[in-house]
């Protein structure tokens, strides 16, 4: 059985400009260039406006660059969304889906995250499905149940 890679990375949220992101990517690659990538893959998930520049700055042997979210349709009337085709066009490797801010601040559902997961996999992105409970759910002692449901619904229909 082939050994699976461990993925380790960061989401820069809405903190870095294009210049900041390119500098961060360059510094991260320089600092980690001597670390074997055989069993580990590093990734950075910057804001949308920095994706093209981050992808141009990356060394594909050292780093993956990903998107903070992705719509589940290739195109359409989805103001503010970004499609898998757009992400492929700028060289995106990995897509983060279901971040707590998308779920709890923007109200995205497990069913919507599932559509995104299936779409991302269909477009051959490495796909990160984020799961987690709120502080209130943790206080009620239902963390495991919440995460189990998020995983079950978020991965529904995934076959590989």
Regions found by a protein language model. Give the residues of each.
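Active-site loop-to-helix "anion-binding N-cap" substructures in soluble metabolic enzymes
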Residues: 1-160
């Amino acid at each position: 059985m082939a050994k699976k890679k461990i993925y380790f990375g960061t989401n820069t949220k809405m903190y870095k400009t294009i210049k900041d992101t390119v500098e961060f990517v360059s510094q991260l690659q320089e600092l980690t260039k001597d670390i074997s990538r055989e069993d580990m893959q590093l990734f950075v998930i910057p804001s949308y406006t920095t994706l093209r520049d981050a992808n141009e700055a990356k060394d594909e042997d050292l780093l993956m660059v990903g998107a903070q979210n992705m719509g589940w349709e290739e195109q359409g009337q989805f103001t503010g969304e970004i499609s898998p085709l757009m992400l492929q066009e700028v060289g995106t490797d990995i897509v983060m889906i279901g971040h707590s801010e998308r779920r709890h601040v923007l109200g995205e559902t497990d069913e919507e995250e599932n559509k995104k997961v299936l779409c991302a996999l269909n477009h051959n992105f490495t796909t990160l499905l984020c799961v987690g409970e709120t502080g209130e759910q943790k206080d009620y002692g239902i963390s495991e149940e919440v995460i189990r449901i998020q995983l079950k619904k978020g991965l529904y229909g995934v076959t590989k």
